[in-house]
């Protein structure tokens, strides 16, 4: 008699994805972040569901409903801060996951990579709309500034912005629809993640060497289930330290002031995980140029397979490309820092140079360096 986990229609899917899945024997801890993202997503959906039970998406009561959650609901403060800081953990895992894909050439799995880029966009949209919901000063002005960027689109821009707002400014209609979208999008993300996994399992995982590992596979369970649990425990430890000791570390103090359309905060800035994009937007004096640059900064990921000129897939044995990769990481950290600074000298010029360097490394330096490495290895 065959095992039920191999014969039952539903169990069979789970078995083939998480138990008997043939996995490369040499994948490192950088491969943990896919499962960590799954855990983050489940955590966000669960905490978000409980927050939605007590939240009201009306401009007059939204701010006080969040205060009510923190003060009056049993463990409401814990749920709220797990959700807020869970988003930060989500983005840390996302950035590392994408970085791993760039470093080890995982973008050569075209379908998996492209679905991943769509997922990145969707998660960013969801996080942005979630930041608007507490209806503090930074929520309101962040929503106003970021949605206003769409008015740079020629001809339809202004109409598009007013259509998104549901009026002539960010108001009740905007808050209600953002809540609706913020609630539904995580389920869209879950569906996309399932497709992402489906395409990945068509090809099998990449590994640090970038060489086919078909002749050396091991079952996912118990080897990688235990490894993923260890990663999850580490992540939960960091998250709990953040939530229980300094829950407001990554937030903005301005968001503890109720939204006031008549009073603009001195420095409008988004959450830390959008600061790199915000720095790119601000580094171009032209509004449309800034919008195009920031969209390009993420859409550029789709071009990665076309920009791959090396004969090797992974950067593991390519020291020159490794230097460029870490330059890119340092550049993104610089952009994140600049995004949180006021628009004044010397931050403006640093932001402009960092933005130019970002595109230069990806579009010019990396492909050229790969060709040089090919020639050095006489390939």
From Swiss-Prot:
Binding residues for a ubiquinone: 201
GO molecular function terms attached to this record: metal ion binding; ubiquinol-cytochrome-c reductase activity
Names of the cofactor(s): heme b
Spans through the membrane: 33-53, 77-98, 113-133, 178-198, 226-246, 288-308, 320-340, 347-367
PROSITE patterns documented for this protein: CYTB_CTER (PS51003), CYTB_NTER (PS51002)
Pfam families assigned to the protein according to its UniProt record, in alphabetical order: Cytochrom_B_C (PF00032), Cytochrome_B (PF00033)
Protein topology in the membrane: Multi-pass membrane protein
Residue positions binding heme b b562: 83, 182
Entry's Gene Ontology BP terms: mitochondrial electron transport, ubiquinol to cytochrome c
Any one Gene Ontology cellular component term annotated for this protein: respiratory chain complex III
Record: residues binding heme b b566: 97, 196
Location(s) in or outside the cell: Mitochondrion inner membrane
SUPFAM superfamilies: a domain/subunit of cytochrome bc1 complex (Ubiquinol-cytochrome c reductase) (SSF81648), Transmembrane di-heme cytochromes (SSF81342)
Quaternary data: The cytochrome bc1 complex contains 11 subunits: 3 respiratory subunits (MT-CYB, CYC1 and UQCRFS1), 2 core proteins (UQCRC1 and UQCRC2) and 6 low-molecular weight proteins (UQCRH/QCR6, UQCRB/QCR7, UQCRQ/QCR8, UQCR10/QCR9, UQCR11/QCR10 and a cleavage product of UQCRFS1). This cytochrome bc1 complex then forms a dimer.
Protein function: Component of the ubiquinol-cytochrome c reductase complex (complex III or cytochrome b-c1 complex) that is part of the mitochondrial respiratory chain. The b-c1 complex mediates electron transfer from ubiquinol to cytochrome c. Contributes to the generation of a proton gradient across the mitochondrial membrane that is then used for ATP synthesis.
Cross-referenced PANTHER family: CYTOCHROME B (PTHR19271:SF16)
Family classification: Belongs to the cytochrome b family.
The protein, known as: Cytochrome b
């Amino acid at each position: 008699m065959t095992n039920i986990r191999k014969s039952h229609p539903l169990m069979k899917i789970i078995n083939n994805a998480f138990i008997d899945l043939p996995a490369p024997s040499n994948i490192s801890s950088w491969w943990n972040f896919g499962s960590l993202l799954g855990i983050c997503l489940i955590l966000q959906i669960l905490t978000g569901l409980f927050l939605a039970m007590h939240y009201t998406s009306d401009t007059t009561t939204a701010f006080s409903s969040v205060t009510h959650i923190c003060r009056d609901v049993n463990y409401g403060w814990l749920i709220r801060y797990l959700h807020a800081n869970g988003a930060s953990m989500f983005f840390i895992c996302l950035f590392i996951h994408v970085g791993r894909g760039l470093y080890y050439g995982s973008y050569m799995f075209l379908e998996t990579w492209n679905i991943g880029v769509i997922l990145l966009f969707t998660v960013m949209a969801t996080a942005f709309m979630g930041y608007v919901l507490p209806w503090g000063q930074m929520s309101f002005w962040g929503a106003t500034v970021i949605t206003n960027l769409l008015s740079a689109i020629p001809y339809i821009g202004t109409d598009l912005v007013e259509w998104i707002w549901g009026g002539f400014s960010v108001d009740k209609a905007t808050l209600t629809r953002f809540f609706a979208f913020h609630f539904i999008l995580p389920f869209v993300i879950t569906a996309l993640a399932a497709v992402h996994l489906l395409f990945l399992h068509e090809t099998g995982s990449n590994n640090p060497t970038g060489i086919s590992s078909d002749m050396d596979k091991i079952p996912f369970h118990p080897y990688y289930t235990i490894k993923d649990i260890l990663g999850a425990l580490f992540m939960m430890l960091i998250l709990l330290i953040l939530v229980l000791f300094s829950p407001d570390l990554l937030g903005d103090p301005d968001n503890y002031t109720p939204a006031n359309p008549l009073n603009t905060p001195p420095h409008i800035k988004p959450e830390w995980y959008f600061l790199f994009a915000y720095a790119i937007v601000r580094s171009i004096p032209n509004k449309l140029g800034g919008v195009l640059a920031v969209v390009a900064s993420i859409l550029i990921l789709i071009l990665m397979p076309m920009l791959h000129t090396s004969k090797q897939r992974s950067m593991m044995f390519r020291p020159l490309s490794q230097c460029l990769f870490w330059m890119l990481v340092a550049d993104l950290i610089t952009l994140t820092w600049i995004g949180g600074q006021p628009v004044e000298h010397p931050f403006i010029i640093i932001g402009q140079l960092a933005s130019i360097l970002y595109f230069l490394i990806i579009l010019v330096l990396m492909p050229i360096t790969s060709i040089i490495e090919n020639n050095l290895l006489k390939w």
